[in-house]
Amino acid sequence: MRRPEQTPAPGSFNQLHRGDILNVLLDAPSHKAGRAWLRTTIGRAADRRAEVIGLAETGGAILGRDWHDIPMRRTGEGRYSLALPLLEVGCFYAKAFFMPDGCSVPQWPEGPNTHIKVEPAEYCCDNTIYAAFVRQFGPNRSKQAATNEHIREISTLDELGYTVIPRSGTFRDVIKQLDFIMGKLRFRIIQLLPIHPIPTTYARMGRFGSPFAAMDFAGVDPALAEFDRKTTPLDQFRELADAIHERNGKVFIDIPVNHTGWASYLQIRHPDWFAHNVDRSFQSPGAWGVTWEDLSQLDYRHHALWKHMANVFRLWCKRGVDGFRCDAGYMVPYPAWEYIISKVRAEYPDTLFLLEGLGGKLEVVEDLLSGADLNWAYSEFFQNYDRSQIEAYLPGCINVSATKGALVHFAETHDNNRLAARSQCYAKLRTAMSALFSHQGGFGITNGVEWFATQKIDVHEAMPMSWENSENQVEHIARLNAILEAHPAFHPGAELRLIQRGPGNVLALLRRAAERGSSVLVLANLNDDRPDSAGWHEAEFPVTGQIYDLVSGKQVTIDQSSGTLQYQLSPGEVVCFTADQNDLALVQHASGQSMSLPDRSITQAMQAKALEVYCSFHGNCDFSAVNIQNAVRQLSHDPRAFCLAVASDGHLFNHEENPGPVVHTGPAPVTTWEWPRDTRRIVMVPPGWFLHLKCAHRFNVELCS
């Protein structure tokens, strides 16, 4: 007997964003009467979180209460479909089945459950990250290198037994550079290396000590603040977070979840929460054959430690943090992560978790992304250098990014040698490749890359980063980020495929957009010391008219004299070709929109809100006949009228091109609270009504029960 067939395929991994609609098709035996259903956990994230939390805190059981059945719509002989809105962030499962009339045994498609990962709406594109080591924004910022005289002076004091810790850069120093970082360079996410207190006169390595040797995960290092009797170091961190949010950005902080510094808050109060060697000494973590002796490794066999760390993440969310880099996160067990993230998402569902899995097994990273609900991870693209290495690595990276969680291409991290130490040409090459080979704009740099800094970052020091160096790649990076923001080939659903043909240390990456079918071709010469020619088959990226380079903005000529198309690249050159001249205008328009939210992200968030409003009134039903564009237009134009129309009959979701103005009468089920008008009065919100918050400026709001 033929078994039903399902799309998306059983066992497949699928990544979407909040506000998307999941389309499920089932092809059942056509000669049988019956009904089809989708058994899924979608829409019941709270139930799953409650069970995960209960298991860790009270020893409860995972009963699978999040599983439920949704009826599918019959569309033809033996054919059924369901269009399911995705309104919650998390990892979900689904599988369709057919129930013949008069039979109590369902017929299932062959294979395991389908995996559906739903990411926050605002992170659907332009996920550009600027990693800032606050300490480096101090007096050394613009220096090329420390002078020998300065080093000798400090060494003399060291020999006399003094502890010498120079002035550090501060949060306010970083604030002064935000217009450049976020406005000029166009980075949307500011990721701070750890900002917690660190050892000073004891257990310190290097001049300043490592920010990864955290003494208190809840605290802020006073060295990162200016002495100001009106504020605290935490207040000044909040100033930075507010300044980033004011510029439509996101703030991530780095929490080294696997370890603390020696004599930390946790080590003194809970020494049993740490791993010990056979001789009962505290165990230090390590990777790549290096042991970090100034760190003490946590032991996640203790569930009380899980609860403590979950509270640390929740505390920083409350303080305005949007996401976290989870240093050495692959060393934390899967069940601990599942619990921690469940606790955080129960209050802050759109929180972003970036896994630092470098040095860990790839299968561990993939499991944490696809099951434990971490969002992104570091890619190892920066550790692959020539054509053969990248050809071997990139296809797998593309697949994981499209199905389990974006692998972010950092051109350079604090652990690596500076790109410009090899050559400025090489730095531009690797920066452009990291950006234009990224998934949904998941691209990052570490401070100083833009200025061709050559001194490797030492986390125990405050190395100069050549700030305002006259030789730089500022304009180059700004252009790359504008391309990532504007062009649909860098947005969700884009297909990425290597198509280079012929010899040479070159790459050709075809990017085909999902939204309007447009394509771009990225060519890269991996040699920074000699030119090379990149080739591809004409059928892959045909040249029938003019071709333009989005990076330089110039029209180019393609060699069509041989069987494959060819383009001569200068040393280290990276280009991004399009056949559509309108793409140039698209990128240019984005370049002129300083520090604004990407249009694509706004649309995605509005889709999510429109679907959320509808489902709150009508339930999580089939959306096959939805015209989401109509709903988004009306919601943007008049939120109150939109809610009234949806509460009445939901006609805004039909397939009419222009459904016309809302004509319903009566009170809209919406209470408006406006700042500052309503700050001194109690505003009543009836049960089941929406709360519409209005303010002339960007704001954060906390809803407390």
Which residue ranges define each predicted feature?
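Aromatic- and acidic-residue-enriched segments that line the glycan-binding/catalytic groove
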Residues: 147-149, 198-218, 257-287, 342, ...
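Surface-exposed beta-strand/loop patches in extracellular or lumenal glycoproteins
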Residues: 27-29, 36-40, 526-544
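The substrate-binding groove and active-site-proximal loops of carbohydrate-active enzymes
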Residues: 135-139, 153-172, 213-234, 262, ...
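Aromatic/acidic polysaccharide-binding cleft in carbohydrate-active enzymes
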Residues: 405-475
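N-terminal structural segment of carbohydrate-active enzymes
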Residues: 2-250, 258-260, 572, 579-582, ...
